[in-house]
């Protein structure tokens, strides 16, 4: 570093910076790259060293030169050549700001030098892999531009001629398709793609492939789509770019093929001058102007003064000369553009560009007094025309009294008489080279001597108008006339309202309106007007025109039927047919609903809406319904609906009777049961006396004498004197008239058992509808529920056994209630009192004879669900209906004995366990006043047996009190069932045995549970041992993995130090120094001093002044010793 003087930092990267330095020995400017290799990963460190090795191998005039490299303080320093003119990317940015493109000469001069550099590295099997404009540097040497290819940081040396690389690197704008796909690898053709992108960017100043995001950019590259190249470049250059940007690498040319092209080979060795030093000469050379200039240009330049306007005129002559050159090649488009840029006073009233060019040429003839006309008019093809212009408009050329000074203003000073000031003539002329029709050779009509005559600008030549009108389409601008009704955006002929067979449309493009009394929509309309969509319309203004579409009529009818099914408005039962009326917003103001003879809307009867009604039961008819003349809709079961009734006509097929019940709980705790039944006799109606008025509103004009009850057996219908109902039967009533019964009852809680009851009872409902019916036959079974004395029961139609089973709800009983009840039974048995005078048990009765009764044990052992109903049942008195006499005394006695034994057993267990948790049992039991006598006969026996039981089981009870476990309900239930069987067979004697067996089973279960707890504890201890072992194993694995991680770090550091030291000392000296330091093995203090001194002498001879880097070698040896 002492040999170089740092000037400034010219670039920074992630691991270092580029510094401009000056060599102190000769003052040469160089670039010093400082790279911190100690902070790099091994891959990045190898890339840095790779660049050093590559630069040291390369020596070419178009590649950045390599001078030296060294490592200092953990940083790698590379000394390389300095490119004093920046890079190509900087030049492209300058041209973009100046809005100037590169000439083809500049592009190909640079491109040939880049190809030479690529040819050189390809010959050494080196891929650059990051070829872009930022890595192509410019250097000015002896006043000429030279290309310098640099930045070989990610270059790769191929091992053989046919090897392929497989790493995706480089800038995304210049990536080749094979690099993106990374499937088959890539070779030198990938650098050709990047070179094509660079060449495209030189021609257009833009990237060939550019997008807003990376996926879009990748898609464009894979498709190979790029904007076209400007047309002012040669076809050879455009074809070359196209061949280099081929998707298939095999179709791309090699570097040798490109350099062998004739138009590329001619630029090899030609120096390129800097752009800022002599831009004008450079442009003249690039356009080859000197070869095309004539002697007349020299004579014309003598008359131009050396003012500031002369420079402007000179720059303006450059595109004129280019236009002359292009005109010789039959390119008239560029000629017209250049002439338009040179003239400032052209007349733009005419739309033909050729006439403007001719006007500009004539203005130049009137303004300038120049000998050579070719300097201002370069498109003439006839020499005779030029001579006539000279004789008529230009004075003698060599007269010293006639100088002209050309300025950028609109006025020119001409040599004229003092009294006359010439004006600019804006006369359009047409030359034979631009207009195909021949013209006269006189260039200006009406002017012969411009120096003596004054010509006004209003004089125009009418000759060129004829050929223009015949060749070019004109725009006719007419005065605004009376507006006509036409179709917007239509090029057809306008149709006047006089013709009645066509439709004159208004400016609204989507609606076709008709003119009243003048025109109508018909099939013979004009072809210029599109036919309207096929709709049924009429031409009379009073009718509906196009609001109702025949396609939408079924949908409208369905919509009307759905609306009519939920409406509650009343209508007459004999109402007429009413068709579908379209919605008001789709109708015109004058439209009325009319019948459609081809597609009439269906009748909105009660049977037409049956498929759409939400029926939740199986009470629908299987036969197709008949249509009636009334309109309405049938409601579903259990919901309010509107229906019509016609006594004389059968609406539904009554061949199949159906019945359904829906249980709907309400907010107040009541339930709504809705049943429906149909019978064969549809005309049987029952008239009742109206003692209780229904709360259903009766609309005026509706009959209220028809009953809604149609039962399966007409003879079984009976009514009570206190509970009647009156339901209207009009077409808009809220109760369906299709033979369905809708009852709403108030039930405090569902029944838990069922029994038969044939007696009739008068009952009233508590719901607002107050509909109640009674039945005296077996077909109407009663659901009797135990309720308080303040509530009444309600009757419904008979149901099947499956519905009754679903309605049974278990009752939850608390432990306090069980304790009080068992204690009462115990006291009654011991003291001898009657059970009926002490117990308060809710008896639930009773199943109908037609339904199979449930088993006794399943009723008693039913799981509880509600505590509120149980408390009500335990506090109220026993309620029995008049139908309990159907139960036999034997069944009641057996049932009571079973219940008594079960409760006695539960009482003993409850007293012994003293458990706080509630014991699950069933509160559903049946009692009767007739069963008290049988229990009283055995009270003395039960008292003696109970005393003996207490003495014999005292020890068992004490053991149960000590135990903390609670017996399972399943064990209690199983022991209860055994106690019931023993009690039924042997009376009170078997009760003792059942209690003893139940106590022993409880003890056995307790022992089993203790054993299970011990086993669970043992399993938990085993699991803890396993968990501890797993934790130890995990810690051991973590320590091992940590040691492996440390070894891995030591390995990576040792490899980095070995590579670093090898690059510093060289491979041979590194091995010798490494072996020398590693062989050092101190034994004693004296020997250690002698060894160190001898080793230092040897090291100084081996490495010389690089002894500073021995510390890195020592670190390497230390890392290897720790691994």
Curated annotation (Swiss-Prot):
Keyword NADP assigned: no
EC number(s) from the headed UniProt entry: 2.7.11.1
One function term, GO molecular function aspect: protein serine kinase activity
Residues at the active site: 130 (proton acceptor)
Listed PROSITE patterns: PROTEIN_KINASE_ATP, PROTEIN_KINASE_DOM, PROTEIN_KINASE_ST
Protein kinase domain ranges (all copies): 4-264
Biased composition (Low complexity): 283-307, 327-415, 478-529, 557-576, 588-617, 642-653, 666-696, 712-738, 752-802, 908-935
Keyword ATP-binding: yes
Residues annotated to bind ATP: 10-18, 33
Class of enzymatic activity (EC top level): transferase
Biased composition (Polar residues): 440-459, 654-665
Record field: catalytic activity: L-seryl-[protein] + ATP = O-phospho-L-seryl-[protein] + ADP + H(+); L-threonyl-[protein] + ATP = O-phospho-L-threonyl-[protein] + ADP + H(+)
Keyword vocabulary terms for this entry: ATP-binding, Kinase, Nucleotide-binding, Serine/threonine-protein kinase, Transferase
GO BP terms: DNA damage response
GO cellular component: cytoplasm
Highest taxon of source: Eukaryota
Spans annotated as Disordered: 283-310, 325-415, 440-802, 866-887, 908-937, 990-1020
Family from the record: Belongs to the protein kinase superfamily. NEK Ser/Thr protein kinase family. NIMA subfamily.
Protein name per its UniProtKB record: Probable serine/threonine-protein kinase nek3
Annotated organism of origin: Dictyostelium discoideum (Social amoeba)
Top-level taxonomy: Eukaryota, Amoebozoa, Evosea, Eumycetozoa, Dictyostelia
